[in-house]
Amino acid sequence: MQHDVIIACDFKSAEDTFRFLDLFKDEERKPFLKIGMELFYAEGPAIVREIKRRGHRIFLELKLHDIPNTVKKAMAVLSRLDVDMCNVHAAGTIEMMRAAREGLTREDGTRPLLIAVTQLTSTSEERMREELLIDASINDTIVKYAQNTRAAGLDGVVCSPLEAGMVHGACGEEFLTVTPGVRFADGDVADQVRVTTPARAREIGSDLIVVGRPITAAEDPVAAYRRCVAEFVG
């Protein structure tokens, strides 16, 4: 897959979302968008259908994590929304991820890309040890989750850019690394711990970067998006 920038549309309503998207109406290539929990839970499938109608690709990030049968049935519903990519939590086990893939696969054999979350970019080793009782290093945990994801037949993982090269080393160059935790060099890291810049993210192995506030909260979102594309895609 070619390198690309995904804008995280972390808005609370359709009105806010479309006001933002209207800024890009003159862009020749419509940005790839991430729809997360807040917007999807507020607006439901209708928001997905309308954004697709406007010509955008969609990463529907709901991070499913439940028993395999429940996830399989949920994915069967999501498969009808014509999104381009969706995800689950790798911690849900190989069995759950396989069930997710089966549920997402349509009768004609096609399906959206399916990836799994390894460790959130807000996670640190200290939190893993103290709150989750995980003594393994964060790098070892991410590699193991990535290997499980590949074994389940998924297309890639969500990880920090700092671990993207490591994931490719363990799972192959064709295995997608989708990375949040990207900020401009002169920007605020906010609540994320493991972050880097767009240019550095590409250098160390990110295939797709997910960027929210540095674009959506910018004084000129279109200019910020173009800057991000220039730094990451070239």
Please describe what each predicted stretch is.
Residues 2, 70-155, 163, 170-174, ...:
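Conserved anion-binding
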Residues 12-24, 69-77, 138-148, 192-200:
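Short, acidic/polar
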Residues 23-31:
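A short, Lys/Arg-enriched amphipathic alpha-helix followed by its capping loop at the start of a domain
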Residues 153-211:
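Hydrophobic secondary-structure block in the mid-to-C-terminal portion of proteins
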Residues 81-94, 181, 191-224:
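Glycine-rich phosphate-binding active-site loops on the catalytic face of alpha/beta enzymes
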Residues 14-19, 39-54, 66-76, 90-113, ...:
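Active-site-adjacent beta->alpha loops and helix N-cap segments on the catalytic face
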Residues 27-28, 54, 81, 152, ...:
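Structural motif
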Residues 3-9, 33-35, 58-62, 86-88, ...:
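Hydrophobic faces of well-ordered beta-strands that scaffold small-molecule active sites
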